[in-house]
Amino acid sequence: MHTKLLFKENVYLRSCRATIIDIVRDKKGVYFISDQTVFFPTGGGQSCDVGEADGIPVTDVWEEEGVVYHRIDTDTCPFSPGSTVSMQIDWHLRIDNMQGHCGEHVLSGAFYSLYRGHNRGFHMGKDYMTIDIALDEDSGFQKITDDMAREAELRANEVIWADLPVSVHHFNRRSDAEELPLRKALAFDTDISIVTLGDENAPADCVACCGTHPSSSGQIGIIKIYKVEKNKDMFRVYFEAGKRAFRQYQHQFDVITELGNRLSAGTDDLLKKFLVQQKKSDAVRDQLYHLKKEIVARETVEIEKDPNLLRCRRYSELSLDDLNEIGKKLSGKIDVLLFLVHQPTCTVLLFSDTCDCGGLVKGNARLFNGKGGGSKKNARAVFTEAESLQRFIDHVSSQLQADTALGD
């Protein structure tokens, strides 16, 4: 028994009624098998349709040896063999998948026709799609440059603007399918579906595919490449198509508009004003760096002059890295213990040439709801509030004074 795939007859069909053939249960859930289905099962790099069956969510669909399994989100299955069920797919997801998958064909065809680039891998992710393009050794191209990607993107969108017909032909024999100008060699011998964009004699693309596609390229809407990166001996192209690309455009436009408002710039001079602002920020950052270096040097000298064996300094403007730098500069000059407190984060750094700083933190921080660790020469402890941090310092100081009779 094979499940009849209604989407092969009409990809725009959103619902149907079917007869339940069997119910399957395992540790992962409950599944039903029906005589026909409107749901597309996972395959060909495309995720499955989701939707409902008599109001019950259908969360996963796959095909095995011609039989389609529908996973339903329920513990007690209301269906039984012989009963009928009404199926409804999530149409928005179907459209996204149709636009995305057909967009992949269009873009792959563009890379192939322009650069003899072969699609060796395809992934439809939640946030973007990717194709892995391998260039022929005799293509004359060593890599896919930004300019090449822009040219392929333009060619792909020109195919969309031409609103070419998208036809799907089914073949039972490999030899019959191979009469078409295929972009890619066939991987199987029977039950072959070939998707062709445009004229079969000179198509924009022609390749085997089991996915769902719109009836014309114009329904894809738009294709946008985001980036190209090296991936082993290929080039991975990140892109989007259709509504997903449009939503990304909207988001990017909103970001650019907000940046323009903040910089009092239009789109024409936004980059120029940003670079000016960046130059100013770099100058301020450089000044801050040198000022902090000077403060760290002065603090190091002041602490070194402090005659107390237990020393504690508090800071709100310097960073933890700055405090760590002070402690390192004083290495070899700390007879007992130095506390450096970073007030914004309720963190204390411990430095010593003679005490086990890590041991002091490990043995005492938890007594005051703190946590931390470190080595013998330096450690840090973090607390939820300033009061707990101060109690920790007082406790450790008293402990050391008792151990070394510093109070005498």
Where is each model-derived feature located?
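Conserved nucleotide-binding/hydrolysis modules and their immediate coupling elements
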Residues: 1-83
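Hydrophobic helix-and-loop "lid/oligomerization" segment in the mid-to-C-terminal part
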Residues: 257-344, 350, 354
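Glycine-rich, acidic loop segments that terminate in or are immediately followed by a histidine
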Residues: 45, 199-219, 310-408
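A conserved active-site cap/scaffold subdomain adjacent to cofactor or substrate pockets
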Residues: 213-214, 218-272
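Functional cores that coordinate and move charged inorganic groups
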Residues: 93, 113-231
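A generic structural motif
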Residues: 30-32, 65-75, 129-134, 347-349, ...
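Active/ligand-binding-proximal structured segments within catalytic/core domains
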Residues: 37-53, 79-132, 376-377
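Short amphipathic
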Residues: 15-22, 168-170, 307-317
